[in-house]
Amino acid sequence: MSKKDFYDVLGVNRDASDDDIKKAYRKLAMKYHPDRNPDSKDAEEKFKEAKEAYEILSDAQKRAAYDQYGHAGVDPQAGFGGAGGQQGFGGFGDAFADIFGDIFGGGARAGGGGGRNAVYRGSDLRYNLEITLEEAARGCEKQIRIPTMEECSHCHGSGAKPGTEPKTCPTCGGAGQVRMQQGFFSIQQTCPTCHGSGKQITDPCNICHGAGRVKSQKTLNVKIPAGVDDGDRIRLSGEGEPGTNGGPAGDLYVVTHIKPHAVFERDGMDLHCEMPISFATAALGGEIEIPTLDGAAKLRIPAETQSGQVFRLRGKGIKALRASQHGDLMCHVQVETPVKLTDRQKELLREFDAISQGAPAKHNPKAQSFMDKLKDFFGG
């Protein structure tokens, strides 16, 4: 059974509020509750998934661990103290009572799914990777270390001390579940004795303490393709947690997070930057040097350029992901007012201002237009 992303299960974004998560869970739980779908295995499975996702995402500490480490961060056998694993409906405590106590009489429990003696696919993992804008634009290879679980080499995954074997659970007879009668409803519940495994370990392994798996770390080289954006996911098949009882391993999802850049702002495939130019260059025109991801480039500034004007350098943006196209670089020029002027500079500016007074509409069209609007406003 594949472990799905908890946010995808509830249909919410990763920045969803607690209230949004609760509303999403209530909607799904009402739709797929076993009492409303007594003969639907699909509804039963979706109800289970929604309950498990809500249990994790409604708890701030568990949610933080899940965001950082994925399913490994909330697997009780991983030593992180969260809920997870291959539980049935049991073990969710307040998550179920909080939502359904007022609907089904409080304290209700439901069960389903096989015990842990069945074959299960390993959990998917998530790794948040920070990269620079240059690395995102050109592509790169990064080495990462991820927390994971591996089969205990001492007991070979049985959880029992070498030389001993787990025994069949006397409570559920190895089924991993027990059935409870509550009023008109017959409800399955994870066995409280073996917690769904169908087995009891009377003499646990002194290395993994009965879990059958131990915490570990592994190093991977991840190829980041050119053009990735913030929040893109790179799937590494089979690099998640190992499966149980011979099941296939899960996948690792590397999520890219691009660091803020000192010069550029990214907008899809396009880049934006601000370039200060002098008053004289704006008025008379000239050539300036601007930065690009490929190095310095020349930009011709036409005469009479205004502050805020945007110049496009085609093909100087970000390469499209898995395509040959490139975005553009949008250069926003900002005309700087000169400061700390010398006496001579002040003299020349005063002379320029005096000359300009004779034809304000010609030399300062925006100012003249504004003055005309003021006259109309005041009835002048």
UniProtKB/Swiss-Prot annotation:
One biological process term from GO is: protein refolding
What UniProt keywords are attached to this protein's entry? Chaperone, Cytoplasm, DNA replication, Metal-binding, Repeat, Stress response, Zinc, Zinc-finger
The CXXCXGXG motif repeat ranges on this chain: 152-159, 169-176, 191-198, 205-212
Q: Can you give the residue ranges of the J domain?
A: 5-70
Coiled-coil residues are: none
* Pfam families referenced in this protein's UniProt entry, alphabetically: DnaJ, DnaJ_C, DnaJ_CXXCXGXG
Q: Where does Zn(2+) 2 bind?
A: C169, C172, C191, C194
Query: What's a single GO CC term here?
Result: cytoplasm
Q: How does it assemble?
A: Homodimer.
Q: Please state what the annotation says regarding this protein's domains.
A: The J domain is necessary and sufficient to stimulate DnaK ATPase activity. Zinc center 1 plays an important role in the autonomous, DnaK-independent chaperone activity of DnaJ. Zinc center 2 is essential for interaction with DnaK and for DnaJ activity.
| Function description | Participates actively in the response to hyperosmotic and heat shock by preventing the aggregation of stress-denatured proteins and by disaggregating proteins, also in an autonomous, DnaK-independent fashion. Unfolded proteins bind initially to DnaJ; upon interaction with the DnaJ-bound protein, DnaK hydrolyzes its bound ATP, resulting in the formation of a stable complex. GrpE releases ADP from DnaK; ATP binding to DnaK triggers the release of the substrate protein, thus completing the reaction cycle.
Q: Which HAMAP family match?
A: DnaJ
Please state which protein family the record places this protein in: Belongs to the DnaJ family.
Instruction: Spell out the protein name for this chain.
Output: Chaperone protein DnaJ
